[in-house]
């Protein structure tokens, strides 16, 4: 963010303009039994690497043939009605715009073009900024509380807040977690083998058995239509509004959720358009620690995995791995199991 020094009459205006940070929400619709959905995984990985915290990803899992733990979590989080409107995976919506897009191709029929649609959304000026704090509510670290402050820069409008709790590094050894991969035998397709994001999947088997899933919704509040009364009916420019909501870690559905890899997302829903006008994502603090405030203070996340010889991996492998983080740094990590 640029620092601008302006005489007093314009100072408040300059601060307001600088403060308005637009973030795009990509709700990606996927499933482990969907063979083309690895393209969606490649798309959100590449997009997160490009945009960092300006892009908020929620990987919503549906029941392609049979229900899975992640599809059950997605429905319990509040995505059941939204999933019913999606006809075919992989797919995505950006800020809940009317059009459903491919999470890799965008509106095109091939190639990595979803960035064109993300850029278009990022160019919009949001009506408000959001800040948030996440903290544990109980000694067992099973429930969290999110406190949100919304600062509006324009009057009017009908807005509500919605909350989503997501988890990273979800995995299991049972067959319901195997990711079907239709790219496994496409290394002779030039469009695939020359694509750095898709080519790694040609080296995988038809069923990827050790896939680690990120951005999976595990709980939510008001996901579909927003929480009634979360914001006042009359919005005044220059005003700040506070709201609190609780969510819980759904270990009743999936016992092995890792609580150190949780994220709280707050959506600013425009009830007149049914779209998301802005949002914020923050890390939930590790269990038995203090709260974490706003996206700027969140810990860096893994955006890509590489082998020691520089090959990009679809997931960490046993042995030495090189991790690229969202803050631009890299780390070497040894995986023993």
Predicted regions, residues:
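Positively charged n-region of N-terminal signal peptides that target proteins for export
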Residues: 1-5, 337
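Hydrophobic h-region of N-terminal signal peptides that target proteins for export
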Residues: 10-18
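Local sequence-structure signature of Cys/Sec-based thiol-disulfide redox active-site neighborhoods
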Residues: 20-60
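Short, small/polar residue-rich loop motifs at catalytic or cofactor-binding pockets
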Residues: 23, 298-301, 317
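Terminal processing/anchoring signals of secreted or surface-associated proteins
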Residues: 34, 92, 289-296, 310, ...
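Short, conserved sequence motifs used for protein processing/export or organelle targeting and
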Residues: 56-288
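Residue-level detector of functionally pivotal "anchor" positions at catalytic/ligand-binding pockets or at interdomain
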Residues: 281-309
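C-terminal tail/sorting-segment detector
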Residues: 320-337
């Amino acid at each position: 963010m640029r620092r601008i020094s302006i005489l007093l009459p314009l100072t408040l205006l300059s601060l307001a303009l600088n403060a308005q940070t637009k973030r795009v929400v990509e709700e990606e619709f996927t499933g482990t039994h969907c063979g083309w959905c690895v393209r969606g995984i490649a798309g959100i990985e590449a997009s997160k690497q490009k945009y960092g915290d300006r892009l908020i990803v929620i990987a919503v899992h549906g029941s392609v043939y049979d229900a899975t733990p992640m599809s059950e979590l997605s429905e319990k989080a509040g995505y059941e009605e939204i999933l019913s409107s999606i006809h075919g995976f992989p797919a995505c919506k950006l800020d809940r715009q009317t059009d459903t897009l491919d999470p890799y191709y965008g509106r095109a029929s091939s190639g990595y073009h979803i960035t064109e649609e993300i850029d278009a959304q990022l160019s919009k000026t949001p009506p408000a900024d959001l800040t948030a704090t996440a903290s544990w509510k109980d000694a067992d670290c099973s429930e969290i509380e999110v406190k949100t402050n919304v600062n509006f820069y324009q009057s009017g409008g009908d807005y509500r807040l919605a909350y989503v709790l997501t988890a990273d590094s979800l995995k299991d050894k049972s067959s319901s977690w195997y990711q079907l991969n239709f790219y496994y035998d496409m290394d002779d397709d030039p469009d695939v083998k020359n694509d750095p994001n898709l080519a790694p999947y040609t080296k995988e088997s038809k069923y990827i058995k050790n896939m680690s899933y990120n951005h999976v919704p595990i709980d939510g509040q008001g996901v579909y239509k927003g929480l009634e009364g979360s914001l006042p009916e009359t919005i005044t420019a220059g005003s700040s509004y506070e709201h609190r909501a609780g969510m819980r870690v759904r270990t009743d559905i999936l016992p092995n959720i890792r609580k150190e890899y949780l994220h709280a997302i707050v959506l600013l829903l425009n009830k007149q358009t049914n779209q998301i006008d802005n949002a914020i994502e923050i890390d939930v603090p590790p269990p038995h620690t203090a709260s974490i405030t706003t996206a700027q203070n969140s810990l860096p996340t893994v955006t890509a995995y590489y082998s020691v010889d520089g090959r990009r991996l679809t997931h960490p492998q046993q042995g030495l791995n090189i991790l690229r983080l969202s803050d631009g740094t890299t780390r070497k990590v040894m995986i023993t199991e």
